[in-house]
């Protein structure tokens, strides 16, 4: 992890929510970006981890893979009604000009009565999207549309 040991931090943005996620590896920065996104929706500390989803995605570049990863998690939240609290990225690979991710997301089916939402995320955007290698590992910047 970098930036003084933080997993992620929220940054000022006029209309949407912007955050930076940190990790020692690409896998860890993807995990922390997902955690940051779900903490916008709900306090993930209140979520159990009794439901799991396996995720495998391919994208043409690393930035698209991050957007696809977060968008897939948001889709599972909206369609399968699962709110996630933990993310395990097994690997991110580059092969034949494509990037792929193999991961699991752990959470629970949500009930609005017991798990009130804080903010609704409409979409993950490419606006100000960055993934960079740093001296301490990796940093990703993401803006989500609310």
UniProtKB/Swiss-Prot annotation:
**Keywords (A to Z) from UniProt:** Calcium, Metal-binding, tRNA processing
Under InterPro entries, the record lists: Archease (IPR002804), Archease_arc (IPR022952), Archease_dom (IPR023572), Archease_dom_sf (IPR036820)
Name the source's superkingdom.
Archaea
Question: Where does this protein hold Ca(2+)?
Answer: 16, 145-146
GO biological processes: tRNA splicing, via endonucleolytic cleavage and ligation
Q: Which GO terms describe its molecular function?
A: calcium ion binding
SUPFAM superfamilies per record:
MTH1598-like (SSF69819)
Its job: Activates the tRNA-splicing ligase complex by facilitating the enzymatic turnover of catalytic subunit RtcB. Acts by promoting the guanylylation of RtcB, a key intermediate step in tRNA ligation. Can also alter the NTP specificity of RtcB such that ATP, dGTP or ITP is used efficiently.
Instruction: Identify the NCBIfam families for this entry.
Output: PRK00407.1
The UniProt family comment states: Belongs to the archease family.
What is the protein's given name?
Answer: Protein archease
Q: Which lineage do the record's taxonomy fields give for this organism?
A: Archaea, Methanobacteriati, Methanobacteriota, Stenosarchaea group, Methanomicrobia
């Amino acid at each position: 992890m970098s930036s003084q040991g933080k997993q992620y931090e929220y940054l000022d943005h006029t209309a949407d929510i912007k955050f930076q996620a940190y990790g020692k590896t690409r896998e860890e920065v993807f995990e922390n970006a997902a955690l940051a996104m779900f903490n916008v929706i709900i306090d993930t500390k209140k979520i159990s981890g009794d439901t799991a989803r396996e995720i495998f995605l391919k994208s043409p570049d690393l930035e698209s893979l991050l957007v696809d990863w977060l968008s897939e998690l948001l889709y599972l939240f909206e369609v399968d009604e699962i709110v996630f609290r933990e993310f395990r990225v097994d690997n991110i690979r580059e092969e034949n000009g494509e990037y792929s991710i193999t991961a699991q997301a752990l959470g629970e089916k949500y009930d609005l009565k017991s798990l009130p939402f804080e903010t609704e995320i409409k979409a993950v955007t490419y606006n100000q999207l960055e993934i960079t290698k740093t001296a301490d590992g990796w940093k990703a910047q993401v803006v989500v549309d609310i």
